[in-house]
Amino acid sequence: MEGQAQPYPFAAVQRGTEVAPQAPFNFSRRYACDRCRGHKLRCIRDQMTVDSPCQRCRKAREKCTIGSSTRPVPARLNRSSQGHKLPGATSSASLTTAAPALSMPPQQALAWATGLGDTEQGDALHLSSVPWLDMFDSAMLDSACDSNHELDFADRSSGSGSGSRGAADDQDGPGDGRVHTITPTSQGTTAVANPFLPGHEFDFSPRFDMPGEQCNSDFEKDCTGAPVHAHLPADERSHVASVEFMHHPVAPIHPPTMASSHRTHSTASNDSSKDSTTGVRDACIQELNELSSTLTKDLHTVVDCKLASSFLFTRSNKGPDEYLFKTLDGSSSQESAIGRMLQGSEKFLDIMKRFNEPAQSAPPFVGLSLRVDAHDFGLLAEAVDGSKNSSEATQLDRRWRILHSYLERRNESPNPLSFGSWLGDNLTYGLARKPDMTAKAAVLLCYTNLLWIYETVFFVICHTLECSPSLAPAIKLPQTVPGLEINGFVLQNHPSLQIKILTQVSSYMLDSVEKALQNMLSDSTFQALLETVLQQEGLQYSPGEETGMISVRCLIDKVNKMLD
């Protein structure tokens, strides 16, 4: 019938017709998704295909659509459409056929486009993008296609001696043998009018992860009313049972180690713990950066004091106290160089203590939960295997009862630490955070500043004690030593006792810093950076002493010997 569009284009194609090879499609920039196009970013896709979301939308968990530009038809539709074009010319009425809505399902778009001409078919099949979550299931479409890629459901429903029964079951459905409207349901599945399935809705699991509570609730509603169909023959009963088994969402019956959708509770708790861990780490790095800037200023102060003490007994026109007092800033005693040195050490220890805390401690009921899950799934596997002597109806009923009881126990006490989440996400329980390069640089800067401050302060004290005639109470020490006047603690006219207290406190602080950096000092990268920085600044570094405290400890020991 030339000049008219055939209502059933698939029926006009002969069996064995060769399909013309499809030209490779050019994926250019105009096929970027709306989100990448709005931000003027490159739309990166896996294997250059638009059948899946791009990398940016998948990472941001946003819906990836191509609404403002054209997109190519999936390969399955192109394959079917090119093999079933109408022979002959099209009518003038088909040339003026209005385009369907932008959200038309792919099957309706295919049936509408086959009634157009060759030129209009190519333009009509390039429809705007349907949301990614509303796409039909590829396995269902492959099973509906015959060996010649034809969507022929009528032959399946009437074949193998069951033609009368298939026609009777499909009384209220259309009989044209084509796939009809696909509508997304409220549960996130897709309902398809399928003639060869009982009823007119076939719910299958979507390609995206569904929340565990929603899957369990829907699954329990179906389990409570699952019939056994004992009145049917054996072959029909097995067919109906297998179809009803496919009707239920498959996600809840898999072990937790095989599907990510069963780790909803654990994923939520893990996300919150990871967010808190990341927040603590970022806060520690920020505090380390602020502390390093403060210690750098303190280092400049004690360096000026070191330069002044080097000329302490070479200038006859100025006394030592007068010279050092004018060299240093006129700040209060609690803000002097030694006071800031000890306060900076205490602040550094506090930050490193929070940085070295374990990410999270393992709860005591982890082993119990693992044993319970293993026991439940062992019963499930035993029920699935079943005994060959028992009937199919008995095995099916036993499977549903075990599954139903297992889901009830999981819903009553949801375990955020399931077996899958424990193996996949919570391997860091009880372990300290592994520092990255940013944390290593911040710790290295604070640590080296502290070492330089301690080395400079004790160099000034040692030089003063060597050049002083005696330690009589009348002799005043340089301005840096009375820095022990912290929080009201002050020793007047007792410089030797004051220096002894300073050496004891400083030794304790250095030991605490070395203990806090035990994990960091064992890192090879941190060791290499520390060695390079210390050698550039002139501090001693030996392979047996990786902390770089040799110079400071030698000066402290020398001062203690002079005070004895």
From Swiss-Prot:
Residue ranges, annotated region (Disordered): 68-93, 152-197, 252-278
Ranges of biased composition (kind: Polar residues): 182-192, 258-278
SUPFAM superfamilies according to UniProt: Zn2/Cys6 DNA-binding domain
Annotated compartments: Nucleus
Alphabetized UniProt keyword annotations: DNA-binding, Metal-binding, Nucleus, Transcription, Transcription regulation, Virulence, Zinc
Gene3D superfamilies xref list: Zn(2)-C6 fungal-type DNA-binding domain
InterPro entries per UniProt: Zn2-C6_fun-type_DNA-bd_sf (IPR036864), Zn2Cys6_DnaBD (IPR001138)
Single GO term (MF): DNA binding
CC terms in the record's Gene Ontology section: nucleus
DNA-binding interval(s): 33-64
Role, per record: Transcription factor that specifically regulates the expression of the gene cluster that mediates the biosynthesis of the mycotoxins phomacins, leucine-derived cytochalasans with potent actin polymerization-inhibitory activities and monocot-specific antigerminative activities.
Protein name (Swiss-Prot/TrEMBL): Phomacin cluster regulator phmR
Organism: Phaeosphaeria nodorum (strain SN15 / ATCC MYA-4574 / FGSC 10173)
Organism taxonomic ancestry: Eukaryota, Fungi, Dikarya, Ascomycota, Pezizomycotina
